[in-house]
């Protein structure tokens, strides 16, 4: 059985339980930070294997990122077990941070929904009577979310060496060019905004930025701007 988890705070009890199952060799545990990516990754596993794949996320807007994959699973009758962590019902509609209305958030796209508030929850229908497709269990957790503060779980982690990327320092790009333009993506190639700004000022080149708020006097929406044939010819 494969399980795909997107780490978070409220789903810590589920994450730790599945981690222990993984250590015992009972499941194949996959970690994906982005919930939308995680859901489609799980959808692919379920489609290839024909087995239900649980996806686990924290509360709030994280749940909404599952929606596209849940719809796809519904349309194609692919078994997907959506496990979403939630705050207790008493905190709903109180203005608590990130308290999204998660109950029935996927509407009719799921074959079954349960808002689980206790350790024992009677299912209204046997799962084997349901048509294949996504099932949503919204599980409420009260704090404390973690049972103890020991470091025993750290023994099961595999520590890998950090990846080192060789990034050229600003000032070494295109030094033989007298005219040019700097097209800056969201991550700026790993360089700081100050370094890019200094580099642009040194060369006297204009900046086209995907994130214009980071730079003063920058042309915004680089991906759209640079796909214009007229502008490309002018450049």
Residue ranges of predicted features:
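N-terminal glycine-rich anion-binding loops that anchor highly charged ligand groups
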Residues: 2-16
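Short internal beta-strands
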Residues: 3-6, 81-85, 205-211
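Thiamine diphosphate
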Residues: 12-89
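Structural motif
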Residues: 6-8, 116-118, 138-141, 183-189, ...
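Conserved thiamine diphosphate
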Residues: 51, 89, 97-133
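Glycine-rich, anion-gripping cofactor-binding loops and their flanking helix/strand elements
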Residues: 47, 59, 65, 184-235
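Glycine-rich phosphate/diphosphate-binding loops that line cofactor/substrate pockets in enzymes
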Residues: 1, 45-50, 126-131, 170-180, ...
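Conformationally flexible catalytic loops at phosphate/diphosphate-handling active centers
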Residues: 10, 26-29, 125-177
